[in-house]
């Protein structure tokens, strides 16, 4: 049996955003509090959990599910950054975060921000 992490310590913010952001994508903060897809190698502030028109909800702390590109992270602590396309990827310039689960077939991870 796996532990249930949904909702664990989740703190979210609503941001006006660039188009193209979808749930599971990494989010970076731009001028005037606008959410955007982080550039390749850029640290991200959270993971998009919902989209309503031009507004997104982004989890800044706690549990989130994210899409990844490149080499699959492993369960445990990994250093992640944006890949420039909305996914997270292994990158030494990123943030060290706890990965609680990896689904290699769907290219998704369960992450504790």
Task: Report each predicted region and the residues it spans.
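Surface-exposed, low-hydrophobicity beta-strand/loop segments enriched in small/polar/acidic residues
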Residues: 1-113
């Amino acid at each position: 049996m796996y532990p249930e992490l949904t909702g664990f310590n989740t703190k979210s913010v609503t941001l006006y955003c660039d188009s193209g952001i979808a749930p599971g994508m990494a989010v970076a903060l731009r001028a005037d509090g606008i959410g955007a897809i982080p550039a390749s190698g850029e640290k991200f502030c959270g993971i998009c959990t919902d989209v309503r028109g031009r507004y997104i909800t982004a989890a800044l702390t706690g549990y989130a599910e994210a899409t990844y590109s490149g080499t699959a992270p492993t369960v445990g602590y990994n250093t992640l950054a944006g890949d420039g396309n909305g996914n997270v990827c292994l990158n030494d310039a990123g943030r060290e975060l706890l990965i609680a689960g990896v689904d290699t077939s769907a290219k998704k991870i369960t992450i504790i921000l």
